[in-house]
Amino acid sequence: MPVFRLTEELIFPPSYLAERDGLLAVGGDLSAERLLLAYRQGIFPWYTEKTPILWWSPDPRLVLFPAELKISISLRRVLRKNVFSVTFDRAFADVIRRCAEVRRARDDSTWIVPGMVTAYSRLHRLGYAHSVESWHEGELVGGLYGVALGRVFYGESMFTRKTDASKVALVHLVDLLTRGGFQLIDCQVTTAHLQSMGAREISRRRFLTLLAENIPEVVHGESWEGESCCGKRP
């Protein structure tokens, strides 16, 4: 199938027209309006400094249903010991910067290019993009960020500089989302790490159905800073 080239018009082709690898469209921009439209339709940007903006809608899709989170025995020990303190939306800029510093082994590149940092920082200011931070002795040692729409959270990236730091951030995120009535966490691309924590693949068709059921027509952004962690204040 052809890969569609986007124009200034705020529109995407249907996701079922994506290539076998999930590539759907090329070009466009990273405006807040386009990004929110993309997420609503199950599409996300993923590209490098050497390529134009690429838009993806893979099939199957890796997702984590909050109730299916798996916590290993060793991770439960870490949680009981309170090795890390966890916060929300307290250091978004630092989290996305640390995630961008994680390089892909095969070509030493990153998909979190400066344009992506700018775009998601804008979404954060609008209350749609959020971060979860894991701290150890006052130092940011792990975390993740993503986008929340309705009852769906779209995970974008995570980093860790101390064993289990990002896993602890994910556990606290799932707790917050569960208490907030969220039904789905989009993990985008399949990885063994996320599968080990309970994520599983579903068809694109089912994924899009879940989005339609859980994202209302009008969605307002809000800050998560100051939210409690697993029932405790951060």
From Swiss-Prot:
UniProt KW Transferase keyword: yes
Protein origin, superkingdom: Bacteria
Protein's cellular compartments: Cytoplasm
Protein name, as recorded: Leucyl/phenylalanyl-tRNA--protein transferase
GO annotation terms (biological process): protein catabolic process
One GO cellular component, as annotated: cytoplasm
Source organism per UniProt: Syntrophobacter fumaroxidans (strain DSM 10017 / MPOB)
Keyword Cytoplasm (UniProt): yes
Family: Belongs to the L/F-transferase family.
InterPro entries (alphabetical): Acyl_CoA_acyltransferase, Leu/Phe-tRNA_Trfase, Leu/Phe-tRNA_Trfase_C, Leu/Phe-tRNA_Trfase_N
